[in-house]
């Protein structure tokens, strides 16, 4: 349940449906009265106090899937449930809402809004055929497609601080998207956005919930959105 009627906590994970690792993990709080959003990134290599060989938080999702019987939907829910347990162990509370965002969904969501303008901080060149991952972006301001935006979110080999460097870029990139939405004062193609979300994203939010949070988000100011 929500801490109070105006405040909601949330968990967002980026889900790699090849290895089922969650290399992007963000927990936040949205106050719909003050319209302030605070988001904390949890590093993928955070160690957990759990039994077995799995120790990193980004492997919890797969562990939950493997320990769940049933069809793929049941296994995905098992992964989410195990992830929520791990987050609760770390933070002491269970987020009100969650969203496990498939990588393809992220591509489609960015394309649905017509791409995004972003100042890529470093040259990003990386290839890994085993993951079907090919990144080829030069540093500088540019208009990114969904595939290019995903490359920015996934790239980490070029940072001196590896995943911590990637987290900083992820936060900066998401802030850039948020600022562009708020400058427009609307979310282009909101219906399409929600359709993609409901089809590709594992979440406990209803369509009505998504529309509510979208409306509330548009009442925020950029300076009231904080990443840590």
Where are these regions (language model features)?
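Non-catalytic, solvent-exposed segments at the cell envelope interface
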Residues: 1-228
């Amino acid at each position: 349940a929500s801490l109070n009627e105006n405040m909601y906590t949330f968990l967002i994970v980026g889900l790699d449906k090849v290895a089922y690792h969650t290399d992007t993990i963000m927990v936040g709080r949205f106050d719909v009265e003050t319209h302030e959003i605070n988001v904390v990134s949890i590093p993928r290599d955070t160690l957990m106090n759990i039994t077995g060989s799995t120790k990193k938080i980004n492997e919890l999702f797969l562990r939950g899937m493997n320990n769940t019987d049933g069809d793929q939907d049941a296994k995905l829910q098992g992964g989410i449930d195990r992830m929520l347990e791990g987050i609760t162990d770390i933070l002491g509370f269970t987020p009100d809402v969650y969203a496990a965002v498939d990588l393809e969904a992220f591509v489609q969501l960015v394309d649905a809004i017509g791409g995004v303008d972003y100042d890529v901080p470093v040259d990003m060149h990386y290839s890994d055929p085993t993951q079907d991952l090919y990144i080829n972006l030069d540093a500088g301001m540019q208009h990114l497609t969904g595939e290019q935006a995903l490359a920015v979110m996934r790239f980490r080999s070029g940072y001196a601080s590896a995943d911590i460097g990637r987290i900083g870029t992820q936060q900066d990139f998401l802030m850039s998207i948020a600022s562009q939405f708020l400058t427009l004062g609307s979310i282009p193609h909101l219906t399409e956005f929600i359709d993609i979300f409901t089809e590709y994203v594992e979440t406990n939010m209803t369509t009505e919930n998504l529309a509510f949070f979208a409306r509330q988000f548009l009442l925020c100011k950029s300076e009231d959105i904080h990443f840590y």
